[in-house]
Structures are given as structure tokens and as C-alpha cells.
């Protein structure tokens, strides 16, 4: 069901501004290189989906910054994951596809082609009602490193 049709016209502008602001913020976090769409063979709860995704990232994508959104499945119970990855060009997308498929289910792992890809991602998945999202910035991408200076510099 598209709840947008139940939003008052005056509030639609505010909702659109929120989507744009979220897209700008996510884009500012890192130069995203890969976008993923990851499903589960079973009806994963939001917590199970998040746990499995984070476990996959820890085991297979150590040192990779990522932003993810958990979204309800449209045609059945359960959740699936959409994510953006950075600092991952040394990883084989084909190998990662196989690892996810063998363990969890169907997936798509594609390169990010433009800023619009990130904005569209946010509009479609992150700002939906009922979506749950998270971010992990690693190493130099972490905000604590942005303005870091040694004492005495």
C-alpha cells in the first residue's frame, strides 16, 4: 500500500525534502562504490536480517564502510537488506554474490554509477515507513578522523 496518497498535499513537500536531505546526508558519508540488494530464503525478522547482514560483513567484508537499510518484503513476511559499500574494490563481487547466495539467498551486488543511484536508494528504501537502517564507517571514514590533528601541529 502506498501511504503517500494519504498524506496531505502540504505535507508532501516536507516528505520530499526529507528524502532529499537523507540522500544528501548518506552521500556525504563516503564515496559509495557498491549497492546491494540481499534477500533471505526464510522469512527473516528485522533483527535476524540485521544480525545475518552484520555477521556477513564482519566475516567477508572486514575494513569496508557500509550503510544499510532493512525493508519489509513486499510479497511475503520478513525483511531483506539494501546496502551501500565503500573501500571494497579489492573484493570480488562475484565471490561475494556466491557467498551470500549459498548462505542466505538471492541477491544483487552492483557498482554505484552516480550520485543519483545513492539518492534513488534513499528515496526507495531508507525513508520508507517501517524501514530500519544503520551505518558503520571504518578507519579514515569514521567521523572522529575528519578533523584529527596531532597535539602541537
Predicted features and spans:
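Right-hand nucleic-acid polymerase module
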Residues: 1-79, 87-153
Amino acid at each position: 500500500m502506498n501511504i503517500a496518497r494519504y498524506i496531505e498535499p502540504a505535507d508532501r513537500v516536507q516528505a520530499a525534502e526529507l528524502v532529499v536531505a537523507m540522500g544528501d546526508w548518506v552521500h556525504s558519508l563516503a564515496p559509495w562504490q557498491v549497492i546491494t540488494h540481499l534477500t533471505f530464503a526464510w522469512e527473516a525478522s528485522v533483527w535476524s536480517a540485521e544480525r545475518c547482514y552484520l555477521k556477513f560483513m564482519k566475516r567477508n567484508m572486514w575494513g569496508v564502510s557500509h550503510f544499510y537499510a532493512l525493508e519489509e518484503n513486499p510479497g511475503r513476511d520478513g525483511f531483506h537488506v539494501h546496502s551501500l559499500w565503500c573501500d571494497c574494490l579489492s573484493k570480488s563481487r562475484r565471490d561475494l554474490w556466491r557467498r551470500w547466495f549459498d548462505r542466505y539467498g538471492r541477491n544483487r551486488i552492483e557498482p554505484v554509477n552516480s550520485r543519483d543511484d545513492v539518492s534513488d536508494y534513499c528515496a526507495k528504501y531508507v525513508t520508507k515507513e517501517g524501514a530500519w537502517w544503520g551505518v558503520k564507517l571504518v578507519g579514515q571514514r569514521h567521523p572522529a578522523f575528519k578533523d584529527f590533528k596531532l597535539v602541537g601541529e
